[in-house]
Amino acid sequence: MSIVIAAKGLGLRSTPAKLNLVADLIRGKDVAVAAMYLKFCKKKAALLIDKVLKSAIANARANYGVDADNLYVKEVLVGKAFTLRRVQPRARGRACRISKRYGSVVVKLLER
């Protein structure tokens, strides 16, 4: 059984739905191909997931001595982190709640 290398990004300032759109692009791909997809994707979530992917690659090199050329993205887990709630004043003395959602990402790599 190969070693699963993981990296987490917690409290990322993007909603889980937006993160999941980008995560679908790299699931099951080689690490080099996944990094290229994220580099040319024009979404903010791509930058956030790219940081987590690079962290997982660095973990593989530093902790396990695994070469990045042999790695592929086994799974990308996207979940809810927390929600900041704000109040926006509206007309006639009313107020509305604004929810600023945060997401979390776990990238797991496996050696081929």
UniProtKB/Swiss-Prot annotation:
Top-level taxon in the UniProt lineage: Bacteria
InterPro entries with a match to the protein in the record: Ribosomal_uL22, Ribosomal_uL22_bac/chlpt-type, Ribosomal_uL22_bac/org-type, Ribosomal_uL22_sf
GO molecular function terms listed in the Swiss-Prot or TrEMBL record: rRNA binding; structural constituent of ribosome
UniProt keyword terms in alphabetical order: Ribonucleoprotein, Ribosomal protein, RNA-binding, rRNA-binding
Keyword Ribosomal protein carried by entry: yes
GO biological process, one term: translation
A GO-annotated cellular component: cytosolic large ribosomal subunit
SUPFAM superfamilies: Ribosomal protein L22
Residues annotated as signal peptide: none
Entry annotated with the keyword rRNA-binding: yes
Self-association and partners: Part of the 50S ribosomal subunit.
Function: This protein binds specifically to 23S rRNA; its binding is stimulated by other ribosomal proteins, e.g. L4, L17, and L20. It is important during the early stages of 50S assembly. It makes multiple contacts with different domains of the 23S rRNA in the assembled 50S subunit and ribosome. The globular domain of the protein is located near the polypeptide exit tunnel on the outside of the subunit, while an extended beta-hairpin is found that lines the wall of the exit tunnel in the center of the 70S ribosome.
HAMAP family linked to this entry: Ribosomal_uL22_B (MF_01331_B)
NCBIfam families, alphabetized: rplV_bact
Family the UniProt entry places it in: Belongs to the universal ribosomal protein uL22 family.
Protein name: Large ribosomal subunit protein uL22
Protein's gene: rplV
